[in-house]
Amino acid sequence: MNIMEIWRYPVKTMAGERLQRARVDPLGIEGDRVVHVEDAQGAVVTSRSHPRFLGHKGTLSPDGEPLVDGRPWRSPEVAAEVMAIAGPRAKLVRYDGVERFDVLPLLVATDGAIAAFGHDHRRLRPNLVIGGVEGLAEREWPGGCLRIGKVLIGVQDLRLRCVMTAYDPDTLVRDKDITRDIYRRFDGKLALNCFVIEAGEIAVGDEVRLARGRACAESTAAAVFGEP
């Protein structure tokens, strides 16, 4: 198996950027979801309720500054567009704590499951796409670990999918049947919720090895519970 794609979403709930290589730290891919949208009451706003955000793209500049459609995230133009979508006083906020993730820091998809899904895999918003995986083999991975060079990733469970899968990433047209199909054929779950056990650098093409057994279980427990 190998890494086919690496994705980062610097602005939570907007479209992301495809990378050739990335640093993986304890909170996932460096620079992922470091900015989010808040409404006038300070609540986090996502494309589940405001899908127009999917039509904007978040990236990082060479110096690590978040951009929205190529513009500084603090610019007046970006601020106006955010309020136009999410309402008066809605704004972008920078925050890099663990709470910025809906579930876990990494979402891993596989080519076999994507083929079974049969639609644009960007609807799944993965961080990593792993190639060389037969069919729905990923569904047997929870409890295991993925070794990518120096990086070790723990696989917790399958991701329960939400309404965002219904939106075409290019046209933003909503097709509820796609989300219904995920629930009908895959019990509502596609791709894997993962966390980082050992940090390091990864790149497209890197070999990925699935590990199981005691060593993986001990590493997983240490990462989750802080055990020595």
Report each predicted region and the residues it spans.
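Metal-cofactor-dependent catalytic cores
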Residues: 1-228
